[in-house]
């Protein structure tokens, strides 16, 4: 089957689309990436998403309209990846669309029950591409008592499980998440959870203090020094002390967190602030390994992916934090994969599993009571 996986993440840097060929289903699936592209959001759409994400500035009319606008954006992104690959849209069998997360409430709080909302209307995508769309992957896991995240572990087992080595996969998107993949000969469980901020705080600080979308290759962070006072403040965030499985998002590490941090520590240079929040991402990742993984799993390889793996300063900070551990650190490209395409490929794989009616959540990662088939199916017009 030919499937387009569509991902718009918490970094808001655009729409990632992976055109993938998948043979079979389940753990024996054979997956080949045909083409990958990122379609940037226009400024107006990005501004509307940012407004929709804000509790103070959002409104139901905006979210209603944006749901359909993003459906068109996702449909156009699928057309673009097919065009770039010289692949006929009529040959496409499925689209797996994650959607744009507007709010994620992984656990009950006050009178709010556990819930999640991703938008990007699948009916619009299906109609505009004349292709079956599978979307809304997180909700069934939450209905089964899970946190709806992380969802990529299932695809990571298919793609990365090694016959003899335990591997640890770290995604560094807007949020960081880790998956422990035991070797094929191991009887240990796959576990996965969010490690805290990935690029989210780094990008927000970069935009506010340097008027740049992100710190390219970590060049600015390389120039500054870590401020221990700020790092201690960040590392005391209650999310870090929670036991897995756990998930987080912009609600905890987004604009409000950055606003409070910058107000509290405005006396420090902007370079030192950026260096310190970069170290916070690295330190939160290393902390979770040492606290929740390395005492229980003998890890041979750590594989870094996502946009953060291109931040050389961040990667070196992670390497330094793990210098005394017996594991080798790679980025996706070192082993023949793409850091950028990883999550989009994951949602193509999840769409394939849903099409075959196979459960594809990992209860040991999400906390769900049982394995369930994920996603809603939207058929095109006849």
Swiss-Prot record:
A Pfam family this chain is assigned to: AnmK
Database matches in Gene3D superfamilies: 3.30.420.40
Transmembrane annotation, as ranges: none
Entry keyword Nucleotide-binding: yes
InterPro entries noted in UniProt: Anhydro_N_Ac-Mur_kinase (IPR005338), ATPase_NBD (IPR043129)
Residues where ATP binds: 9-16
The UniProt record lists the keyword Kinase: yes
GO biological process: 1,6-anhydro-N-acetyl-beta-muramic acid catabolic process; amino sugar metabolic process; peptidoglycan turnover
Class of the enzyme per the UniProt entry, highest EC level: transferase
Annotated keywords: ATP-binding, Carbohydrate metabolism, Kinase, Nucleotide-binding, Transferase
E.C. number: 2.7.1.170
Pathway info: Amino-sugar metabolism; 1,6-anhydro-N-acetylmuramate degradation; Cell wall biogenesis; peptidoglycan recycling
Reaction(s) catalysed by this chain's protein: 1,6-anhydro-N-acetyl-beta-muramate + ATP + H2O = N-acetyl-D-muramate 6-phosphate + ADP + H(+)
GO molecular function: ATP binding; kinase activity; phosphotransferase activity, alcohol group as acceptor
Function, as annotated: Catalyzes the specific phosphorylation of 1,6-anhydro-N-acetylmuramic acid (anhMurNAc) with the simultaneous cleavage of the 1,6-anhydro ring, generating MurNAc-6-P. Is required for the utilization of anhMurNAc either imported from the medium or derived from its own cell wall murein, and thus plays a role in cell wall recycling.
UniProt xrefs under PANTHER family: ANHYDRO-N-ACETYLMURAMIC ACID KINASE (PTHR30605:SF0)
Entry-linked NCBIfam families: PRK09585.2-1 (NF007142), PRK09585.3-2 (NF007148)
Similarity remark: Belongs to the anhydro-N-acetylmuramic acid kinase family.
Annotated protein name in UniProt: Anhydro-N-acetylmuramic acid kinase
Lineage of origin: Bacteria, Bacillati, Bacillota, Bacilli, Bacillales
């Amino acid at each position: 089957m030919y499937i387009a996986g569509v991902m718009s993440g918490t970094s808001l840097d655009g729409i990632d689309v992976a055109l993938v060929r998948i043979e079979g289903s389940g753990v024996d699936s054979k997956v080949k990436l045909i083409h990958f592209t990122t379609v940037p959001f226009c400024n107006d759409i990005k501004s509307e998403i940012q407004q929709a994400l804000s509790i103070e500035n959002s409104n139901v009319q905006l979210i209603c309209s944006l749901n359909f606008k993003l459906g068109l954006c996702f449909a156009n992104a699928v057309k673009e990846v097919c065009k770039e690959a010289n692949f006929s849209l009529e040959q496409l069998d499925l689209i797996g669309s994650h959607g744009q997360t507007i709010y994620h409430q992984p656990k009950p709080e006050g009178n709010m029950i556990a819930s999640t909302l991703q938008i990007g209307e699948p009916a619009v995508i299906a109609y505009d591409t004349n292709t079956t769309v599978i979307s809304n992957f997180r909700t069934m896991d939450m209905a089964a008592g899970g946190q709806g995240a992380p969802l990529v572990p299932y695809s990571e087992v298919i793609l990365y499980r090694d016959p003899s080595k335990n591997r640890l996969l770290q995604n560094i998107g807007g949020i960081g998440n880790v998956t422990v993949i035991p070797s094929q000969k191991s009887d240990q469980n796959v576990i996965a959870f969010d490690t805290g901020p990935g690029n989210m705080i780094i990008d927000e600080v970069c935009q506010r203090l340097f008027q740049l979308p992100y710190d390219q290759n970590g060049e600015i962070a390389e120039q500054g020094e870590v401020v221990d006072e700020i790092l201690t403040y960040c590392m005391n965030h209650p999310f870090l002390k929670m036991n897995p499985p756990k998930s987080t998002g912009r609600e905890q590490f987004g604009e409000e967190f950055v606003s409070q941090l910058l107000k509290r520590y405005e006396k420090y240079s902007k370079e030192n602030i950026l260096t310190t929040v970069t170290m916070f991402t690295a330190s939160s990742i290393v902390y979770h390994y040492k606290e929740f993984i390395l005492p229980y799993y003998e890890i041979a390889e750590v594989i870094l992916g996502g946009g953060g793996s291109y931040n050389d300063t961040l990667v070196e900070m992670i390497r330094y934090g793990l210098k005394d551990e017996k594991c080798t650190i790679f980025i996706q490209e070192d082993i023949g994969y793409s850091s950028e395409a990883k999550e989009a490929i994951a949602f193509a794989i999840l769409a394939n599993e849903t099409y075959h009616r196979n459960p594809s959540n990992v209860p040991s990662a999400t906390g769900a009571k049982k394995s369930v088939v994920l996603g809603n199916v939207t058929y095109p017009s006849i």
